[in-house]
Amino acid sequence: MRKIRLTIEYDGTNYHGWQIQKNAKTVQEVIQKALSKLLGEDVGVTGCSRTDVGVHAYGQVAHFLTDSKIPGDKFSYAINNLLPDDIVIKNSEEVPEEFHARYSAKGKKYRYLIYNSPHASAIMRNRSCHVRPELNVAEMQKAAGYFKGEHDFLAFQATGGQVRSTVREIYGMEVYVKEDNMISIEVSGNGFLYNMVRIIAGTLIYVGMGKLHESEIPGIIAGLDRTKAGKTAPAQGLYLVQIYY
């Protein structure tokens, strides 16, 4: 059997996340059906990140096994012909047997977009979080610095997370203003807890609004109390940008 790695981009608006669920359309299910149709057999696809409802991806990674003779780099073209416009296979390649989309990953990079304007955006409504009050980006940038390094991020895990350890390392976090009232939070690390990036984004929004002071962040991290951090920011602002191997 050959192992094929896929790099996938998708708009998560119309999907109930990545992972297959009963009675709900998911990205994994749509890709598996396309592959099964292409190859004429049932195909299982294993993804790296189980993105939630409404979350988008530029660089989701998945793998599948096949006996097909199709060249590894040609699968992307063949599968894309069978996929809806909001899911695109950006790259496909044959990889060694020991590669695993999830367990071989060394880290991930996420982006969270905030549309900071008194008026909502018709175009970006499903691709960013709308915040009306003007945010103090300088304070958000100061606050972001406290997250870097290895910490116990229990205060930034949503209910339902099931992991042995809540310690994670953040490699980098940047907050900057893009064009057209858009603020971007970029964060990379060796792993993330359930809803961790969205809770960090919600906390930085609180700092930008003045509901929290940037100097309070170390205490919130050390306190391990979810109620002290900000609200979980909406899913539509979150993007899985890249997975590191």
From Swiss-Prot:
The active site is at 52 (nucleophile). Its EC number is 5.4.99.12. InterPro entries: PsdUridine_synth_cat_dom_sf, PsdUridine_synth_TruA, PsdUridine_synth_TruA_a/b_dom, PsdUridine_synth_TruA_C, TruA/RsuA/RluB/E/F_N. Keywords: Isomerase, tRNA processing. GO terms for biological process: tRNA pseudouridine synthesis. SUPFAM superfamilies: Pseudouridine synthase. Substrate binds at residue 110. The keyword tRNA processing applies. NCBIfam families: hisT_truA. Formation of pseudouridine at positions 38, 39 and 40 in the anticodon stem and loop of transfer RNAs. This is tRNA pseudouridine synthase A. It comes from Ruminiclostridium cellulolyticum (strain ATCC 35319 / DSM 5812 / JCM 6584 / H10) (Clostridium cellulolyticum). The lineage of its organism: Bacteria, Bacillati, Bacillota, Clostridia, Eubacteriales.
